């Protein structure tokens, strides 16, 4: 096997995106797709929510509600609204790239990522929700340019299927959605069409380092010499890091998700509440998520989570009590101590880059 200038480890959306951008630069790249169950792409509804997530009112609000009952947040976890302004700027810029990226990927790969300009609505059921959201909204760096405070009447007009038992909603107009599976497939196919080598069902067994320089990647099938390895292994990034002699603080965080039967279009925006998020995809399925669980690499689905998420979705959209669930599944998000991605080189190790720890924002930041 010839020399691969760049080897990307990880076949989720981040790994496929990295391989695409490297191939687009004309470099020789090999993408190693390890056979791992439950990678983060499968735990995503495909939300592009730079504003909602940055201020703590995206799907992360479910987690914050849970830990609030404990009195304090776990060590190393920031509270709502405390993600750095630099991350918000980064996320907004990333989101703004998607319309052009969608066209580009469709042209190169032939795959439509089903980008929809939807907005995100945070529903406020009671005074507690309102008190929680208002200061975050008031401190939002983008101010009133990309956000709106909707009255119950305005919400009912915008989304007739949403419950009337609300005090209002906060709308983030710059937050959208796409199909996460099609995004990963499009990045992968586009990378291949630009010359990337894709190794599927290939287990990485080691990273060869000599005198502080990465020299190659070992797999069960072959040794692949390279000048640079990029660790995009998602929840398994720590394992890959240790093969290179470094420690990366990435851990698996399980998210369980529900999907309904196909329905006519009844929801335009994506919904976020303190119970769940709800998003209707282009093909009619409604996605309901998501738990945030520290259970290691367990990708099982639990009846208790299904019940809790279902109740939250019905509270947001009473119509759903008469709708059948079609599927349930889970995925492992790559959590980091501060919920921010871990990117770039590592001191003392040449030829190695991290592209991991994206937690809930891997789709957005791909």
Task: Describe every region a protein language model picked out.
Residues 175, 349-366:
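Glycine-rich phosphate/pyrophosphate-binding beta-alpha loops
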Residues 89-92, 122-132, 170-189, 300-305:
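Short beta-strand to alpha-helix junction loop
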Residues 33, 151-152, 200-202, 327:
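Short loop/edge segments at beta-strand edges and connector loops
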Residues 12-13, 235, 360:
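Residue-level detector of alpha-helix initiation sites
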Residues 17-24, 34, 46-53, 60-80, ...:
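Active-site substrate-recognition segment that forms the wall
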Residues 47-154, 312-314:
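Dinucleotide-binding Rossmann-like beta1-alpha1 core, especially the glycine-rich loop
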Residues 169-228, 236:
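Helical element adjacent to the flavin cofactor pocket in flavoenzyme catalytic cores
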